[in-house]
Amino acid sequence: MRRPAIALVVILLGLGLITGGLAWLLDSPKPPAGASHVERLYLGLCATCHGADGRGSWRAALFLIRPGKLAEAARGEHTEQYRFDIVKGGGAPLGRPGMPAFGASLSDDDIRTLVAYIQNLGRMAASGRAGS
C-alpha cells in the first residue's frame, strides 16, 4: 500500500516540474528591438507574472499566484512610494507575499524608473489605450 502512494507523489511532482518548466519557457515576453532600458527591465522582471501589457499572465495562475493587474485603472489607488517599496522590498511586508523583492538586484534609480513605467500602464488603461 505504501508503494502506490510513493509512486503517486513522484508522478505528481514530476508533472508539476514539467508543467512549471513549460509555463516558464513558453510565451515569455521578449523585448522588441530598440526597447528602452525600462522596457527591458519590465519585460525581464515583471511581465512573467504581470503580463507584457500589465493585465496579468496565465503563467502566474499556474502557480496559484494572483499578481496585481497593473494596467487596471483601479491600480491607480497606490502611491508611488507604495510601488517603490513593494518593488524594492517585496510584497511580504505589505501583505502581498507572492511579490519578490528586487532591491538587491536593482538600483533605487532603476526602481523609480520602473515605478513610473508601471504607473503609465495604469494611465493608459484608464484612457483605454493599454495594449494598443
What are the functions of these language-model segments?
Residues 1-12:
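N-terminal Sec-pathway targeting helices
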Residues 12-18, 54:
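Hydrophobic core
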Residues 16-43, 128-132:
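Electrostatic cytochrome c docking/interface patches
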Residues 36, 77, 105-109:
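Soluble non-cytosolic domains of exported or imported proteins
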